[in-house]
Regions:
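Dynamic "connector" segments at or just before major functional cores
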Residues: 1-171
Length: 171
């Protein structure tokens, strides 16, 4: 039995007044279209915004091209899409679907990509707790991240469970 599509087009949330539409007629193809669904889910639960709030950005605002929420969102979405290596971001920084999901169709300044590359994201991932240094101007609050994981878990349930079992595998 052949598959039947009920719609020729599927519309997602607009980005900077532009329509984002999935068409099934064969035009430009991307392997990252799942990012649009992840982005819609994120907008409903606020994961990226809440996770980004666990970091402190000490960078000079007038010199920042990629804001903290964009950095965190780019990394979270890439991990969810299966891109676990930071080196992947030198290619992903030019991906129009990932950029649209993050609400960035283009960079604010000439010569920059819409999203960050591996070096900038490396500084985010290795953000130390405490005072900023020359190369680490983004810090994290480990306790806030731990609280967020618990909050997200509890938000996903109608009533808090009687018991939570953490099954940690050290292998």
């Amino acid at each position: 039995m052949p598959a039947e599509c009920s719609s020729d087009r599927f519309e997602f949330a607009r980005v900077a007044s532009r329509a984002v539409v999935a068409g099934f007629d064969g035009g430009t193809i991307t392997s990252n279209a799942g990012a649009l669904l992840l982005g819609a889910t994120d907008r409903s639960i606020g994961l990226v915004q809440r996770f980004a709030a666990c970091f402190v950005d000490h960078r000079a605002p007038d010199q920042v091209e990629h804001g903290l929420t964009t950095l965190v969102g780019q990394r979270v979405l890439a991990l969810a899409l299966g891109y676990e290596d930071l080196a992947d971001h030198d290619h992903l920084r030019h991906d129009p679907v990932l950029a649209a999901t993050m609400g960035r169709l283009a960079a604010r300044r000439a010569g920059y990509a819409a999203l960050a590359g591996k070096s900038t994201l490396n500084r985010l991932e290795h953000a130390p707790a405490g005072e900023p240094s020359r190369y680490h101007r983004i810090g994290h609050d480990g306790a806030a991240i731990e609280r967020l994981f618990v909050e997200l878990f509890l938000d996903a349930h109608r009533t808090p469970p009687e018991e939570i079992v953490l099954d940690l595998d050290a292998t």
